[in-house]
Swiss-Prot record:
Chain coiled-coil ranges: 48-75
Organism: Shouchella clausii (strain KSM-K16) (Alkalihalobacillus clausii)
Keyword field: Coiled coil, DNA-binding, Transcription, Transcription regulation
Signal peptide: none
S-S bonds: none
Taxonomy, superkingdom: Bacteria
UniProt cross-references to InterPro entries, sorted A to Z: GreA/GreB_C_sf (IPR036953), TF_GreA/GreB_CS (IPR018151), Tscrpt_elong_fac_GreA (IPR006359), Tscrpt_elong_fac_GreA/B (IPR028624), Tscrpt_elong_fac_GreA/B_C (IPR001437), Tscrpt_elong_fac_GreA/B_fam (IPR023459), Tscrpt_elong_fac_GreA/B_N (IPR022691), Tscrpt_elong_fac_GreA/B_N_sf (IPR036805)
GO MF, one annotated term: DNA binding
Protein name from the UniProt record: Transcription elongation factor GreA
GO biological process: DNA-templated transcription elongation; regulation of DNA-templated transcription elongation
Similarity section: Belongs to the GreA/GreB family.
NCBIfam families membership: greA, PRK00226.1-4
Length: 158
């Protein structure tokens, strides 16, 4: 059997996944089963859009449950205490300055399971994170983005 992919995450990220899994199993799954029962009571399933919709929801919920269980089972916890605080690594927050315009941005590098660009959490697999990992304060880094190359300077790591 092929080795399953490891999912790097913080304790906070793992907790969020566990909470979502708990909700899906204890609440959402039951809601969908009830919708299926109600839709079945309408009779003929061949032209029953409520039934079809509920079955689609069930497939989505069960798929997400399986996905979350796998991610949690293969979680590798990021422990910042064991990492040099002066080096960009998983779990670290990095403040950057785009060059030459001077615009500042801040990102936390997390595992792909908990990445959320809208919250400033970028996946360790992203081009930005790949360019930053292992670098230190004052390093200048060229990042390949979909919009072209971008140069940044690392201002702070925490």
């Amino acid at each position: 059997m092929a080795e399953e992919k490891k999912h790097y995450m913080t304790a906070e990220g793992k907790k969020k996944l566990e909470e979502e899994l708990h909700y899906l199993i204890t609440t959402r799954r039951k809601e969908v089963v009830e919708r299926i029962k109600v839709a079945r009571s309408f009779g003929d399933l061949s032209e029953n859009s409520e039934y079809d919709s509920a079955k689609e929801d069930q497939a989505f919920v069960e798929g997400r449950i399986a996905q979350l269980e796998k991610m949690i089972r293969n979680a590798v916890m990021i422990e910042n205490e064991k990492v040099d605080g002066n080096v960009v690594s998983l779990g670290k927050t990095v403040r950057l300055m785009e060059l030459p315009d001077g615009e500042e941005e801040e990102y936390t590098i997390v595992g792909s399971a908990e990445s959320d660009p809208f919250e400033g959490k970028i996946s360790n697999d992203s081009p930005m994170a790949q360019s930053l990992l292992g670098k230190t304060v004052n390093d200048r880094v060229v990042v390949n983005t979909p919009g072209g190359e971008m140069e940044v300077e690392i201002l702070e790591i925490r």
